Amino acid sequence: GGLGTRISEETHLKPKPMIEIGGRPILWHILKLYSAHGVNDFIICCGYRGYVIKEYFANYFLHMSDITFDMSANKMEVHERKAEPWRITIVDTGEETMTGGRLKRVASYIGDETFCFTYGDGLSDVDIKASIDSHRSSKKTATVTAVRPPGRFGILDMEGDNVSGFVEKPDGDGGWINGGFFVLDPAV
């Protein structure tokens, strides 16, 4: 939903989840992660340039398959359809809407089941199934994946005016931060 101001050279044309990594949008990678853990029913909260996401999935076979266009007959033939087991609901939740407002807007699509939630611009190797299992066994309303971030900058070891060593982005200060992957009960 955010505007992606830190990566504006990409996001003036498309929303952050549609920025490509390895030839596929970040959003595709997120869905593949969840799908690998058995989650295949998705609700995508759209904000800024949400139509780009809608167009991507509306034309998914064009993006993922070999295609022959017969211009004289006005026909298109899709070869080797690469289908995913996904069911995707795309909801316009507004450009300026905060996270809680987006969840409220899609509540009718969620129903009364426990659900997973993540941001559309973060990738990870989170064990989604383990997160769901942990959430269910804890009987909590909300479970968040916490991570310890690396330091933001490399550190120089100095001896007087000379650099004597360098540590590339050492571990952070030991604090935990929101890893961006949640398991939530509808009561949220």
Language-model features, listed with the residues they occupy:
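N-terminal glycine-rich phosphate-binding loop and ensuing alpha1 helix
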Residues: 1-59
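Short Gly/Pro-enriched turn/cap motifs at secondary-structure boundaries
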Residues: 9, 146, 171-174
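Short, flexible, basic/aromatic active-site loop/helix in glycosyltransferases
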Residues: 158-174
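Conserved nucleotide-sugar donor-binding
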Residues: 179-188
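Alpha-helix/helix-capping structural signal
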Residues: 2, 48, 129, 186-187
